[in-house]
Amino acid sequence: MRIAFLGTPAFAVAALDALERAGHALVTVVAQPDRPAGRGQALREPATKAWARARGVPVLQPEKVRDGTLAAALRALAPDALVVAAYGRILGKDLLTLAPHGALNVHGSLLPRWRGAAPIQWAVAEGERETGVTIMQMDEGLDTGDVLLQRALEIGEDDTSETLAPRLAALGGEALVEALRLLEAGALVPVRQDAAQATLARILEKEDGRIAWTRPARRISDRLRGFTPWPGAFTTLEGRTLKVLEARPGADVATPAGEPGEAEVVPGRGLAVACGGGSALLVTRVQLEGRPAQSALDLANGLRRKRFRLGT
């Protein structure tokens, strides 16, 4: 097939690799514009643009996608289908309907669960044990189109969104190629989503990483895993931000007496922090504002205290 590909970050590159291996003709790669990144705020090109440049595939980076200009450019390339993977923009009807097979989306969840911009992060943060990828026929709604094909994937006990994303991306590439094969053969049966089962994976905000110690330890641990690498998990210690880098539910440690947020040294292991429901979180690695990352025990040794309160 002649494919016009719309995608921006590293997650989308696995789909490009899969399309290339399967012998599809990529007529263009559409990515978001280069953006400032890093401490120096130098312009950085999207991962998909780098992939395309290395192979001589034409790249488009429009600032706007709903003014008709992009639709006209793609229509001139006569693609058989548009493939969208983490492009980061909402497409209008002119784009969704310009190719004979419409627009197919590679989405990082088992729709209708986790519609929206951060499906991988929220699946992990909400403690789910299974997720997957969906190949969807796009419509004008937010991930509301018919499901064409799905593949499930287990979320490991120690998975973070960072470790899970590459596996989902690879699975998405495989599912995409299979869906295109079935589409060409006329063997796909679109399935309407059950809106009553939908959940929203909204865009993450910095404040999502703030730890509420009144939550059970398991919930705090899941959110730490889901929000790694950003926004992470953080609290405060005497007015200074304290990032919690590594922690797990402390089922085998005693819960410190007192209110949620009370922390107590567990010799040789870390800090036990009182959480909601009488549970404890065993914190093993942290980073105090203005300091490098360190073990939780080193933090306590530096404070010369065996017990203190977090969230203050």
From Swiss-Prot:
GO terms for molecular function: methionyl-tRNA formyltransferase activity. It catalyses: L-methionyl-tRNA(fMet) + (6R)-10-formyltetrahydrofolate = N-formyl-L-methionyl-tRNA(fMet) + (6S)-5,6,7,8-tetrahydrofolate + H(+). This is Methionyl-tRNA formyltransferase. Gene3D superfamilies: Formyl transferase, C-terminal domain, Formyl transferase, N-terminal domain. Keywords: Protein biosynthesis, Transferase. (6S)-5,6,7,8-tetrahydrofolate binds at S109, L110, L111, P112. Its EC number is 2.1.2.9. InterPro entries: Fmt, Formyl_trans_C, Formyl_trans_C_sf, Formyl_transf_N, Formyl_transf_N_sf, Formyl_transferase-like_C_sf, GART_AS, Met-tRNA-FMT_C. Attaches a formyl group to the free amino group of methionyl-tRNA(fMet). The formyl group appears to play a dual role in the initiator identity of N-formylmethionyl-tRNA by promoting its recognition by IF2 and preventing the misappropriation of this tRNA by the elongation apparatus. Pfam families: Formyl_trans_C (PF02911), Formyl_trans_N (PF00551). Belongs to the Fmt family. GO terms for cellular component: cytosol.
